[in-house]
């Protein structure tokens, strides 16, 4: 019994430390993936707002192809006037332009660009970036489906790595204790 307690005392701090490190690695990679999901939309929203501020027409900054956001990972753009009314959109949800949260537009009106995870319905999650322009707002977005698949893979790999490290450290400690007992005997 004393040997088991000794093994637990040696292994438990290692188990806790490795759990913390695996969690830190997972969170770092997950956040990197999620923040990277905004990169194309930042450029799209900023470029469209610049063009609109320079006098371009609303239709010229919105892609002609419609994107059914429930089924596609393609990026899309929605342009709103200053009251939040949709002026043009390349996004549809079941054939209609989805409603975007007015609170986000209010925030952007006061603070500037915002990056928001938007879920217009269950199972449809979008990485969106909203940029103000002189007469309203430009929102660029795309599906998080692929990013979330990668996050799940990283979560699984982190869990497997943690279990492997726990098993390896436990085996080393047990073997070390057994060898030490034989030498003492």
Region roles according to the model:
Residues 93-159:
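Extracytoplasmic
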Residues 14-16, 20, 28, 64-67, ...:
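Short, well-ordered helical secondary-structure segments
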Residues 42, 46, 51, 61-123:
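Extracytoplasmic ligand-binding sensor domains of the Cache superfamily
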Residues 1-40, 131-185:
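Alpha-helical transmembrane segments of membrane proteins, especially the N-terminal anchoring helices
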Residues 7-10, 26, 75-77, 88-89, ...:
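Broad hydrophobic/π-residue packing in well-ordered secondary structure
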């Amino acid at each position: 019994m004393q040997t088991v307690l000794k093994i637990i005392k040696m292994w438990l701090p290692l188990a806790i430390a490795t759990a913390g490190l695996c969690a830190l690695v997972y969170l770092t990679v997950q956040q990197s993936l999620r923040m990277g999901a905004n990169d194309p939309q930042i450029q799209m929203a900023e470029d469209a707002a610049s063009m609109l501020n320079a006098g371009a027409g609303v239709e010229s900054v919105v892609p002609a192809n419609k994107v059914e956001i429930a089924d596609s990972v393609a990026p899309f753009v929605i342009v709103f006037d200053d009251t939040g009314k949709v002026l043009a959109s390349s996004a549809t949800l079941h054939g209609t332009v989805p409603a975007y949260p007015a609170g986000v537009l209010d925030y952007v009106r006061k603070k500037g660009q915002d990056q928001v995870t938007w879920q217009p319905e269950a199972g449809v999650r979008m990485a969106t970036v909203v940029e103000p322009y002189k007469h309203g707002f430009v929102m660029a977005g795309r599906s998080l489906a692929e990013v979330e698949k990668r996050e799940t893979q990283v979560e699984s790999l982190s869990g497997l790595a943690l279990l492997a490290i726990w098993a390896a450290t436990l085996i080393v400690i047990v073997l070390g204790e057994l060898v030490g007992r034989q030498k003492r005997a």
